[in-house]
Amino acid sequence: MTLTVRVITPDKVVWDEEVQELILPSTTGQLGILSNHAPLLTALEIGVMRVRPGKDWQNIAVMGGFAEVENNEVKVLVNGAELGTTIDAESARQAYTAAQGALEEANRGEDKPNQLKASNNYKKARARLQAAGGAV
């Protein structure tokens, strides 16, 4: 049996296919979903969602949101998402390095809003790099 997975952002549908299994970056850790999973609603962290439509796994960078599992359908509603295959690994690596430096700089100061923004940007850059297949 398979699961129908839809990844939806405010702008578009990023993924709408059947998969054998998927792994979600929930706020409590990685969450594996197979067919006939119990109904579930979970918050998602910024990270990499992995789907296996056939033999091979595919990565999707997700920028936080929610996932609902019910009746072999998974709806993933996120602030942003990109297929790993569409992300340029080199530019993702450069963005990650820049975000890492900005986070280190922000953490030296006392400006909490700036620290939170830098941390969020770092998580997004890390998710994009990992989805593109780059090591962090």
Curated annotation (Swiss-Prot):
Stretch list, region Disordered: 100-120
Keyword entries, A-Z: ATP synthesis, CF(1), Hydrogen ion transport, Ion transport, Membrane, Thylakoid, Transport
This protein's record includes keyword Membrane: yes
Keyword Thylakoid carried by entry: yes
CDD domains assigned to the protein according to its UniProt record, in alphabetical order: F1-ATPase_delta
Assembly notes: F-type ATPases have 2 components, CF(1) - the catalytic core - and CF(0) - the membrane proton channel. CF(1) has five subunits: alpha(3), beta(3), gamma(1), delta(1), epsilon(1). CF(0) has three main subunits: a, b and c.
Protein name: ATP synthase epsilon chain
Organism: Synechocystis sp. (strain ATCC 27184 / PCC 6803 / Kazusa)
UniProt lineage: Bacteria, Bacillati, Cyanobacteriota, Cyanophyceae, Synechococcales
